[in-house]
């Protein structure tokens, strides 16, 4: 049975009547652990592995302490409905792209903690981010600058253990490299411009216009055409820049 700990007590999943893509990250983490309790594969590693969840919806820990020499900050996410702390510009880049990526329904920084024994040594690992995709898949992400950050063999073995635990529970685990997301490209510039207006206000009429145009279209519509339907010059500018790529 998976060792699932919320705060100092074991949590039990309440019945969910909402689609997985609409659940909170913590609720979906909890659901996966509950489903895994009858898995023979999980029982083979659960004796030395447990997943600790935060006591409430939100990050496992706040990373901004004022003592770190690394660039830290907070990203105000409309999609997550809360500010998300980051420990590097690579993590921030993942947040920015997650905010714009329509495949991402929700996401959260520092979502849980894995505790396990590897080679007789107690280990602890906190993922950089967890994302819920539109199809209900839960992704656990480790964010690195590039492949050179994985040169340490012991660290790779640590990630391999976490990846194995995720597969057994039914989560996806992958390493995301931030360097390509921060490169000076037209695509990244467009993502930056769009996310810059992520907190813009819109009403039911705007949503209706977009749904109406998409439903009537025989193929995917360019962003610029939707922007013209809304009369939004800022988004039109973003579309024009993207079109000149």
Label each region the model flagged.
Residues 1-245:
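Electrostatic, structured charged patches in enzyme active sites and in nucleic-acid/phosphate-binding
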């Amino acid at each position: 049975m998976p060792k699932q700990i919320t705060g100092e007590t074991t949590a039990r999943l309440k019945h969910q009547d909402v689609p997985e893509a609409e659940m909170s990250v913590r609720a979906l983490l909890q659901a996966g652990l509950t489903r895994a309790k009858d898995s023979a594969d999980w029982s083979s590693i659960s004796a030395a592995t447990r997943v600790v969840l935060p006591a409430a919806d939100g990050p496992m820990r706040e990373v901004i302490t004022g003592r770190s020499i690394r660039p830290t900050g907070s990203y105000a996410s409309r999609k997550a409905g809360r500010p998300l702390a980051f420990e590097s510009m690579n993590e921030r880049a993942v947040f920015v792209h997650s905010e714009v990526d329509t495949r991402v329904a929700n996401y959260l920084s520092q979502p849980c903690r894995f505790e396990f024994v590897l080679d007789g040594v107690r280990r602890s690992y906190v993922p950089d981010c967890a994302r819920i995709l539109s199809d209900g898949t839960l992704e656990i992400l480790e964010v690195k600058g590039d492949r050179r950050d994985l040169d340490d063999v012991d660290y790779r073995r640590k990630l391999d253990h976490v990846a194995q635990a995720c597969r057994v529970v039914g989560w996806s685990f992958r390493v995301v490299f931030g360097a390509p997301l921060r490169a000076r490209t037209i695509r990244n510039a467009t993502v930056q411009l769009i996310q810059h207006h992520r907190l813009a206000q819109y009403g039911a009429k705007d949503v209706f216009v977009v749904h109406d145009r998409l439903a009537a279209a025989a193929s995917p519509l360019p962003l610029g055409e939707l922007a013209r339907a809304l009369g939004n010059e800022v988004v039109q500018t973003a579309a024009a820049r993207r079109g000149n790529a």
